Design a protein with these regions (language model features):
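Non-catalytic cap/lid and distal C-terminal segments of serine-dependent acyl enzymes
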Residues: 2-259
Length: 259
């Protein structure tokens, strides 16, 4: 026996699956990467990992050791393809928010033995995906126990204006308005409404590198959320908008979630 590998007395073997399927919501073929235990103890907990603007669903598996981090946790990890959608239902276009929050959970639950309990479902992402994770969790607070954002685009108005300046037309079209501040795509507005309604809010974990170009926006969101009394854990450390930072903090977030 190799020392350390089987110290617990159990052998955990993870399967990596690349799933191609037809999305009725998007009206086209799409893809999803999944990491699941080959054997399990009851229904699996679920972690959704969302990618950033310049990547796709394969990036978490290629740039981190997420399969190793998920090992032994009785956890399924799903990495969907959100394209450059900002996880929005794009006006006159593809409905990625509905795809992510409604269609994909139903698809994977038909394939795997997954828990549908709120306390067993989690969502996280980086950059655009960090924005998407917070937005989807705050839009559907009854479905997720916690959400994590790594270097997230959390001041969506500021980011929109930057994209407008740089003439990134596809991103500007995602939100369907000239200024998404305070609207249904703004995590601040969603959080404010939940607090005002006295609703149960998912726990939030936020991490950003101190050299990240989104650092000031992340500090602004942190202070805003704390001002509302939201249950938000914030961490920062040396680093910029890179996988070296995200690979470290996805591990910290998974432990914080209790996975």
């Amino acid at each position: 026996m190799v020392p350390g590998i089987f110290a617990s007395g159990k052998v955990f073997i993870m399967a990596f699956l690349q799933i191609a399927f037809h999305s009725n919501v998007l009206g086209m073929a799409s893809s999803l990467d999944a990491i699941v235990p080959q054997s399990q103890n009851g229904p699996l907990k679920v972690l959704w990992l969302l990618h950033g603007l310049s990547d796709d669903h394969t990036i978490w598996q290629r740039r981190t050791s997420i399969e190793r981090y998920a090992d032994g946790r009785n956890l399924a990890v799903f990495m969907p393809n959100g394209a450059r959608s900002f996880y929005c239902d794009i006006p006159g276009g593809l409905r990625y928010a509905t795809h992510m929050a409604e269609e994909l959970p139903a698809i994977v639950r038909s394939m795997f033995n997954l828990s549908d309990r709120r306390e067993d479902n989690f969502i996280a992402g980086l950059s655009m995906g960090g924005y998407g994770a917070f937005k989807l969790a705050l839009r559907h607070p009854d479905r997720y126990a916690a959400a994590a954002s790594f270097s997230g685009v959390l001041d969506i108005g500021s980011f929109y204006r930057m994209m407008e300046r740089d003439k990134v037309a596809d991103v500007l079209g995602d939100f369907g308005c000239r200024n998404p501040d305070g609207g249904p795509e703004d995590p601040r507005a969603l959080l404010s409404k939940l607090v005002a309604d006295g609703a149960e809010i998912p726990r939030l974990y936020q991490a950003c590198g101190t050299e990240d170009f989104l650092y000031a926006d992340n500090i602004s969101f942190r202070d805003f959320a704390r001002g509302l009394g939201a249950d938000l854990t914030y961490e920062e450390g040396p680093g910029s908008h890179t996988w070296l930072f995200w690979d470290t903090y996805v591990q910290r977030a998974m432990n914080w979630m209790g996975l």
